[in-house]
């Protein structure tokens, strides 16, 4: 064992027995190598582990040096919103579909992870968005997002009329099905499907992507990540929502605005030493291949 990491947390909500097997193999492998291991409570219960140190996501964030998320991108997003609040590094083993954020191949995870534990890794700081639903600047509901904050109708699809202010200066108005406000991390997710640009992870930028705008001139807009975005609504309705990473929904009531800004904290995401963002674009999303 080395001194790069002492306590390692195992997190992620398994959707099938294969993923659960990966959790168990990882736990026993780390214990055999002499690491202190914390297991998320739900995983420990499902594996029926005895005499194991367990904790919530927050407790793992407070006590562990590294969190290994086993699952797909959804598992990573759910865990990352909590773990980003703490001084902990995060890496993922892919047991989902795409696995854009979970780098490690489950069939070769032990060797890749061994290299990471020896200190051979690439570190990135990924910023989050904070979304507030407020009335007269009095905060009412708040959440965070790694990928994106999306304005959309609640249950029935319909046109929304709204205004967008950037740093309290009017930017544009729009009639559309909604708006995607994305981080660079989220630029390869929902934003990409809506025609948004790909932003490399190190950019300090936020992209605003219209969803089915009722105009021929609407285009995605890229702004500085230090900007504050305010959404105001002209026709008051009680069925609008914002969703964070497609996992948390906040309702918007009549007379309320939405404020979106960069979080004060960030996610410490790490990758194997041979990680390449552009190779990931190619292998996961079919980005153009080399010609020679």
From Swiss-Prot:
GO CC term, one of those recorded: cytoplasm
Subcellular location: Cytoplasm
Keywords: ATP-binding, Cytoplasm, Kinase, NAD, NADP, Nucleotide-binding, Transferase
Active-site residues per Swiss-Prot or TrEMBL entry: 73 (proton acceptor)
GO BP annotation list: NAD metabolic process; NADP biosynthetic process
GO molecular function list: ATP binding; metal ion binding; NAD binding; NAD+ kinase activity
Residues involved in NAD(+) binding: 73-74, 147-148, 158, 175, 177, 188-193, 247
Cofactors that this protein relies on: a divalent metal cation
Catalytically driven reaction(s): NAD(+) + ATP = ADP + NADP(+) + H(+)
Main location: cytoplasm
Top EC class for this record: transferase
Assigned EC number: 2.7.1.23
Family statement drawn from the similarity comment of this UniProt entry: Belongs to the NAD kinase family.
Function: Involved in the regulation of the intracellular balance of NAD and NADP, and is a key enzyme in the biosynthesis of NADP. Catalyzes specifically the phosphorylation on 2'-hydroxyl of the adenosine moiety of NAD to yield NADP.
Protein name according to UniProt: NAD kinase
